[in-house]
Amino acid sequence: MSLRPRSGRDWGRLDMNYNTYPIADLIDEIAMGPFGSNIKVDCFVDKGIPVLNGSNLEGFELSEKSFRYVTEEKADSLKKANAYKGDVVITHRGTLGQIVYIPQTAQRDRYVISQSQFRVKCNKKVLPEYFVYYFHTPIGQHKLLSNASQVGVPALARPSSTFQKIEIEIPDLETQKKVVKLIGSLQTRIKTNAEINDNLAA
């Protein structure tokens, strides 16, 4: 297995065959967040189902450091905006370029995405972790932001349709698993070092 330096386009290649797919062929489901009028300020409660915001989409996987909540009944009424473990969440308005997956170790069974986000459910061709890692590479970010408008609040034009037309190269599942394991190991080391530094500074 070769890990020699590659170009941005060849990120993650392990000397394996890659196939190119439009995202529409890699997902089973895509859904936009609710209209703003469907989640007003008076909808929020002290406990319930978490509603995601931009601070939850920093890094590769969902951050659970800060939430606002709606009742289970309200979340039920926003069924298409409910995101579950294994789903991928993308920002389409505001801080563009954000994309995370919800890990199987997530604290909650479900979440509600905001009006500035959309979610996808990957099919069996691609691991959600690999899918997200790809879009954190320079070439992935370029493709993700290719339909961005900078007039007013930054936003992706027609996000659900344009996103599905993006073509990406993916290897076989076994290679995806190797990449995910490698990057996961690096993330763990980085997190551990950060915790050590925080303890030393305390």
Task: Give the residues covered by each predicted segment.
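A short glycine-rich beta-alpha junction/loop motif
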Residues: 16, 110-118, 149-180
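Structured loops at beta-to-helix junctions and adjacent beta-edge loops in soluble globular domains
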Residues: 26, 52-55, 123, 171
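A generic structural signal for short beta-strands and their flanking turns/coil linkers
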Residues: 48, 66, 114-116
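A short beta-sheet element
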Residues: 53-54, 72-140, 152
